Design a protein with these regions (language model features):
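A short, conserved structural fragment
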Residues: 587-601
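Short amphipathic alpha-helical interaction segments
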Residues: 572-588
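Short amphipathic alpha-helical interface segments
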Residues: 529-569
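C-terminal accessory regions of radical SAM enzymes
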Residues: 4, 20-22, 35-69, 73, ...
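Glycine-rich beta-alpha loop elements in corrinoid/cobalamin-binding modules
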Residues: 8-41, 93, 100-222
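Conserved C-terminal portion of the radical SAM core fold
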Residues: 1-4, 27, 300-301, 306-310, ...
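Radical SAM [4Fe-4S] cluster-binding motif and immediate context
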Residues: 229-394, 406
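Short, amphipathic alpha-helical interaction segments positioned at domain boundaries
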Residues: 600-639
Length: 639
């Protein structure tokens, strides 16, 4: 069997999807070859341009390849897409956009021809395509070429882009696909291959769509089949590294090794965020910590790479007590990416840092309590700020988004955020964001009326990538158009927040600082250089003032502040002049924006210089399909 992955996966990651399936097939006695052909396309058009295109909304990456399906299949080269100016504001140099898209057409055609010619596909009886990130157009184009060249070949699609009704729709619109797997592929792929080889019908094979002898598309019920947490799979990335060497890319990028330690989301299983459509299977399962550690050690030893990219939707909570301390105890000098929930304690973040987790995506999404409640995030704004502050101290890079345009939001939320953001200039700004999108499987999508959303169908631009009936297009894609119920009122203005975010990014790039340094004798000084266009301001603190400021590090309920500080630090409380003196000091700090009033608490904003970790270079922006923007070299794009 051949296992294939096409653009637009990140070239800096081997395909864990193919490696997982190959391992499962080996355990069933079925041989397979892995073909990570997205790397070839990145090498052909240049990694900078590849990353730029791959991070755009899905309709344009899909169109780059779908025109090579519908052109020869239906005589439609999908040129109408060009009239829509599909790059929008996302292309760095608009004057080059048309030239780049025009140049891609013959290059992509040549890539597809070479792909079929350079591999002996006659060696295989089944080809499986993994579809995850805007890979449908490319997979359809290649499936057509292979099926026409080798009519006896069986073609299977699977992956998250085939979940739910999307999979059966693929069968309806593409006659070159024989079966589509909707569920986790390890559960059924071996049985599916055996049935193909034995010429047995696919009827009753759970979670698989297929055609009857009469051509009708049938989807077998999944029966809640999910992978358990006791599996044992050995990931093999040999094919990827051989490909890098063959293409001359081994010295041009720093790969990350993807791994998986859980599936599902322990928070989403209880309360799914309203906008989140990451997957249709939220049931949470974590793998055995010892098995994960053994796999990481084997991968590092075999490939000499110590950068690990977790594919988990969320870090398993139990790993704070098991996997991460064990990594630290063994002294591994590793670097990790993980997705986490934002309401972590500092001690938990210290555990992450000690294990080498230097890049997190915490799902902050907003800094306003009302907006976070609308999203059902389960966190408060002060917890998001604490995470940013502590990650800054611990040398953990945060990639996070700021979302706008939620149904039911108010202008007051954005007024509050616009006032708050300049006070946070010393912390990590959002790396992405914008108006929320309507994704399949999200609560907003599943129950639009309950949230004041009027569903309009598939995103309008997809019709230029897939010229099919609207009812099929609505079932095929992940991104959808919508309007908001007029009863929700006029759209709120976000210009002030967007301008504040731009200022935040500029200040952060210029080294904005707000830091408390503790001196001998218990005294301290706060250096405030958040406004990088002005000279920094020094705020000397005596011992009692330093103690109070440190006390506010995690935030203290304002109503209980005097009572608790007197209880815990009686001598300092008296030195400050009791409750009235302490209140006057806090008022001065509030006026200077050294502390803020948030969620009913008084929260200190300065990071602690005495506990800052050594600064490390942030992870590369092209490491994976994350929220981080891609830096593009103009000369490389033109070349």
């Amino acid at each position: 069997m051949a296992l294939v992955s096409l653009p637009w996966m990140s070239p800096t990651l081997p395909s864990i999807q193919l490696a997982t399936l190959a391992s499962a097939l080996r355990q069933e006695g079925i041989e397979s070859d892995v073909h990570e052909l997205y790397v070839d396309y990145g090498a052909r058009i240049g990694l900078n341009l590849y990353n730029l295109l791959g991070n755009l909304l899905g309709y344009l990456p899909e169109w780059v390849f779908s025109r090579h399906y519908y052109g020869p299949e239906q005589g439609d080269d999908l040129a109408a897409m060009l009239e829509q100016r599909p790059f929008g504001d996302d292309f760095p140099w608009p004057e080059l956009a048309d030239s780049v898209l025009a140049a891609l057409e013959p290059v992509t055609e040549e890539y597809l021809d070479d792909l079929v010619r350079q591999t002996d596909w006659s060696r295989y009886d089944v080809v499986g395509f993994s579809l995850t990130i805007s890979q449908l157009g490319a997979s359809m184009a290649v499936a057509r070429r292979l099926k026409r060249a080798f009519p006896a070949l069986r073609v299977v699609f699977g992956g998250s882009q085939c979940a739910g009704p999307m999979g059966s729709t693929i069968l309806r619109i593409c006659p070159y696909v024989d079966a589509v797997v909707h569920i986790e592929g390890e559960l059924v792929l071996a049985d599916l291959v055996r049935r193909f080889r034995d010429r047995r019908p696919l009827r009753g094979l759970a979670g698989v769509s297929h055609r009857t002898s009469g051509g009708e598309v049938v989807t077998e019920p999944a029966a809640e089949l999910v992978m358990g947490g006791s599996r044992k799979l050995d990931l093999d990335y040999d094919a990827y590294f051989h490909r890098l060497l063959r293409l001359g890319l081994a010295d041009k990028m720093n790969p990350w090794l993807p791994f998986e330690s859980s599936r599902g989301c322990w928070y989403g299983q209880k309360v799914q965020c309203t906008f989140c459509g990451l997957h249709d299977i939220m049931e949470f399962r974590a793998w055995d910590a010892d098995a994960v550690l053994a796999q990481l050690e084997r991968l590092q030893e075999r490939y000499g790479v110590a950068r690990f990219y977790s594919m988990d939707l969320i870090l398993p909570r139990e790993y704070l007590r098991t996997l991460l301390p064990r990594i630290a105890e063994r002294g591994h000098d590793w670097m990790f990416f993980y997705e986490v929930k934002a309401n972590m304690r500092r001690s938990e973040l210290e555990t992450l840092a000690a294990a080498g987790i230097r890049w997190v995506q915490p799902g902050i999404e907003s800094l306003d309590a009302d907006l976070l409640a609308l999203m059902r995030k389960g966190v408060k704004p002060h917890q998001n700020i604490l995470l940013l502050k502590w990650c800054h101290e611990l040398g953990i890079y945060c990639g996070w988004n700021l979302l706008y345009g939620l149904p039911g939001e108010s202008q007051a939320s954005y007024t509050r955020m616009a006032e708050l953001i300049p006070k946070l200039a010393h912390l990590q700004p959002p790396s992405g964001g914008g108006r929320f999108q309507l994704h399949r499987f999200s609560p907003y999508f599943e129950h639009p009326e309950a949230h004041g959303i009027q569903w309009q169908g598939a995103h309008r631009m997809y019709r230029y990538a897939f010229p099919i009936a609207k009812e099929d297009l609505d079932q095929l894609v992940y991104l959808h158009d919508f309007t908001l119920d007029p009863a929700l009122g006029e759209p709120v203005g976000t210009a002030a927040v967007e301008a504040a975010v731009q200022g935040w990014r500029r200040a952060n790039r210029s080294g904005a600082t707000l830091a408390l340094t503790e001196l001998s004798g218990g005294q301290g000084v706060i250096l405030d250089h958040r406004d990088v266009e002005k000279a920094p301001t020094r705020h000397p603190l005596n011992q009692a003032e330093t103690t109070l400021y440190r006390y506010l590090d995690v935030g203290v309920a304002e109503k209980l502040l005097a009572e608790r500080f007197q209880r815990d630090h009686r001598a300092c409380f008296d030195a400050l002049g009791g409750e009235s003196g302490m209140a006057a000091l806090v008022a001065r700090w509030l006026a200077d924006d050294l502390v803020i009033r948030i969620d009913g608490k008084i929260l200190a904003l300065a990071v602690h210089a005495n506990r800052m970790a050594p600064r490390r270079q942030p992870p590369p922006a092209d490491a994976a399909a994350a929220s981080e923007p891609v830096l593009v070299d103009r000369a490389a794009v033109m070349t």
